Each structure stands twice: as structure tokens, then as C-alpha cells.
């Protein structure tokens, strides 16, 4: 087991509610690490509707999911939160009163005084491609996220998909791989136009092999890919060499391992105390779409409110002997100093 990362608070989920919770906790001198199964911050805003307008953020008539994420990241910059992306919490073990040892599927271990679940509707789980036997290669040579780019250096990479994730990793990994093949079922891509243009430039320069069709079979031994068979749209067949495959077929939402953490659940949601947003387990809080209480509205602004109240209770676990005086950022010079305001 790797050495534990010690932090005051660990937040599960780096969507808008998790990010704003960093701000509220930071004002109280609470240090935060965040874990998210996605490979980028922003949660549903970044993954499902980055360019979709949002009209119900107070004081902002219209902002996109991407724009909101960028603004929140700028707002929390003074507090230097640490992000662990592309990882999913697997186990939560109580080690104090309160205190928790938390382990991710990547083997990262945290020890925290407070755990905040801000996981939206649950964990985004990658959709498995409809290729026979693909599960035998998962985790060794078939990957649904890129955790460390250097692991793909010098490899023959096969990327499958036509959205932003497929295009982004095509562009990012192309300079370091030995060879790269991009497979999509049609010659029409859903990603950002600029990314599509850059991808086609790689094809034109011979740095990327674009195949229009579908993967029908994989070849390899002991979990290590060696090649793939592609049925092209003209009904011909292509055989390619590959030792790493990245399929991007979208995501589904599942509750995931949260169900095994000893929390009370109601219809796959976590009931909370509306004064503190604490769960039935002392020291574990739930904010945002993952929680439930009478009158709950699944709005981003509701999650912001919940994060503010959560922080006022969480700080008492972090600093049990410290008297916390509520202050306003408009008038408190100490808070303004933390924010870097002159």
C-alpha cells in the first residue's frame, strides 16, 4: 500500500458543487484534496454540456458549463486544492472519531478528517465497446482514461470514438506514440471543430491512420493487446497492430462504490441533515445532486448553498478546539488577504 496522503478534507467529485466547497472550506483555513473519476474537472458541466448555456446561476444571466468551471477554478486558486483525476474511490475505512482512510482504484490512499461526497448523480462509468472479449484486456492494455500520458510513450495506440475525448487524446498522445490509429463508425465527428481540423491535419501528414468502421475483434495474450480487426464501411476488413487501446464510447451514471460506505440511502440518494448536510456517519457530508431531503431542488445554486453550510460544520472536525467566527468577504481583511485582495 502506498503512503497515505494526509489532508483535512477529501472531496469526492470535482463538479461545480465540489469546487465551490473548496472555496468555502478555504476561507476557514481547511486544506482540501479532490478525487474525480473523470479526467478533467467540472463534472457534468464539463463532460455532458460544456458549451450548453446555463441560465440560473445567480448574478450571471448566461454562462456555459465550461465557462462556469473556469470561473470556479479561478475563484479557488488561492487555496491551492490538489486534484486526483481519473480515479474512483473504492473503499472508505473509519480510523478516527472522525477520521477516514480512503483508497482509490489507482491505489492512492488518503487519510482525512472529513469526507465530502459531491458526486452528482453518482460515478460516471465508461461504456464498454461491443467487442467480444474486450474485458480480458481491460486495465492492462485497454484503458478508458489516461492517468499518465507517459505510459503510452512509444506504443502503437488504437483510439476508438468520435467525440471530444477521442479527439483530445488523439491530439495529446500523437506526439509521443510510435503509431496511432483512430477508428470511428462514420466520417463525421462530434468534437470541437478545431480539434477535428487538427486531427485531419495529422491524417494528411501521415502521422495518424484514420479508419472509418468498427472494431470486430481483438488479438493478444494474457491481457496484452497485439492487434485488432476492423470492419470498414465499404465492407472490407483491415488488420492493425496495436498494444494499447483507448475506447471512448461515452459514459453512464451509476451510484458506484458509494453504496458500500455504510451510508443510509433512499432511492440511491444520500439523506442529510439540512442544517449541516452531514450524513448518518459523523464526518461524512453529502452535497449536490447526490443528496436528498424534503424540498430538495437539483440545482447548482442549491449545491453552492449546501457547500457553504457543510463547511461551517466540517471545520469543527478539523479544528475542534478553535472558535470559528463567521466573517464576510466584503468586510473581513483577513479573508481578503487569503483571497489575495489588495
From Swiss-Prot:
Q: Extract the InterPro entries matched here.
A: FAD/NAD-bd_sf, FAD/NAD-binding_dom, Fd--NADP_Rdtase_type_2, Ferredoxin-NADP_redctase_2
Q: What is its EC number?
A: 1.18.1.2
Main EC class the enzyme belongs to: oxidoreductase
In the UniProt record, does the keyword GTP-binding occur? no
Q: Name one Pfam family in it.
A: Pyr_redox_2
The UniProt catalytic activity note for this protein reads:
2 reduced [2Fe-2S]-[ferredoxin] + NADP(+) + H(+) = 2 oxidized [2Fe-2S]-[ferredoxin] + NADPH
Q: Carries keyword NADP? A: yes
Instruction: Tell me the domain of life.
Output: Bacteria
Q: How is the cofactor bound?
A: Binds 1 FAD per subunit.
The alphabetized UniProt keywords are: FAD, Flavoprotein, NADP, Oxidoreductase
Task: Give the Gene Ontology MF terms in alphabetical order.
Answer: ferredoxin-NADP+ reductase activity; flavin adenine dinucleotide binding; NADP binding
Obligatory cofactor(s): FAD
Q: Which residues bind FAD?
A: 17, 36, 44, 49, 89, 124, 289, 330
Q: Which family does it belong to?
A: Belongs to the ferredoxin--NADP reductase type 2 family.
Self-association and partners: Homodimer.
Name of the protein in its database record: Ferredoxin--NADP reductase
Its source organism is Rhodopseudomonas palustris (strain BisA53)
Amino acid at each position: 500500500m502506498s503512503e497515505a496522503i494526509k489532508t483535512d478534507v477529501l472531496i469526492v467529485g470535482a463538479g461545480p458543487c465540489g469546487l465551490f466547497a473548496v472555496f468555502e472550506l478555504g476561507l476557514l483555513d481547511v486544506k482540501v484534496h479532490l478525487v474525480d473519476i473523470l479526467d478533467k474537472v467540472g463534472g457534468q458541466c464539463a463532460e455532458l454540456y460544456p458549451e450548453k448555456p446555463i441560465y440560473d446561476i445567480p448574478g450571471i444571466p448566461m454562462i456555459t458549463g465550461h465557462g462556469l468551471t473556469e470561473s470556479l477554478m479561478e475563484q479557488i486558486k488561492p487555496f491551492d486544492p490538489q486534484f486526483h483525476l481519473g480515479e474512483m474511490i473504492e473503499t472508505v475505512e473509519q480510523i478516527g472519531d472522525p477520521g477516514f482512510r480512503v483508497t482509490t482504484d489507482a491505489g492512492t490512499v488518503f487519510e482525512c478528517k472529513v469526507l465530502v461526497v459531491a458526486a452528482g448523480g453518482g460515478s460516471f462509468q465508461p461504456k464498454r465497446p461491443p467487442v467480444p472479449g474486450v474485458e480480458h484486456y481491460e486495465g492492462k492494455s485497454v484503458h478508458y482514461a489516461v492517468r499518465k500520458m507517459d505510459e503510452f510513450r512509444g506504443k502503437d495506440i488504437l483510439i476508438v470514438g468520435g467525440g471530444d475525448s477521442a479527439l483530445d487524446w488523439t491530439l495529446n498522445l500523437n506526439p509521443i506514440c510510435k503509431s496511432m490509429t483512430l477508428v470511428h463508425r462514420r466520417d463525421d465527428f462530434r468534437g470541437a471543430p478545431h480539434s477535428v481540423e487538427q486531427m485531419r491535419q495529422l491524417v494528411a501528414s501521415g502521422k495518424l491512420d484514420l479508419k472509418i468502421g468498427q472494431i470486430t475483434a481483438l488479438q493478444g495474450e494474457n491481457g496484452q493487446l497485439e492487434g485488432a480487426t476492423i470492419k470498414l464501411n465499404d465492407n472490407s476488413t483491415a488488420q492493425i497492430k496495436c498494444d494499447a487501446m483507448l475506447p471512448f464510447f461515452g459514459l453512464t451514471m451509476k451510484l458506484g462504490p458509494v453504496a458500500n460506505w455504510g451510508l443510509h440511502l433512499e432511492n440511491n440518494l444520500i439523506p442529510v441533515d439540512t442544517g449541516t448536510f452531514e450524513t448518518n456517519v459523523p464526518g461524512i457530508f453529502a452535497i449536490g445532486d447526490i443528496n436528498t431531503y424534503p424540498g430538495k431542488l437539483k440545482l447548482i445554486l442549491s449545491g453552492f448553498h449546501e457547500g457553504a453550510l457543510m463547511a461551517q460544520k466540517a471545520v469543527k472536525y478539523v479544528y475542534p478546539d478553535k472558535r470559528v467566527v463567521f466573517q464576510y468577504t466584503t468586510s473581513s481583511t483577513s479573508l481578503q488577504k487569503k483571497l489575495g485582495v489588495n
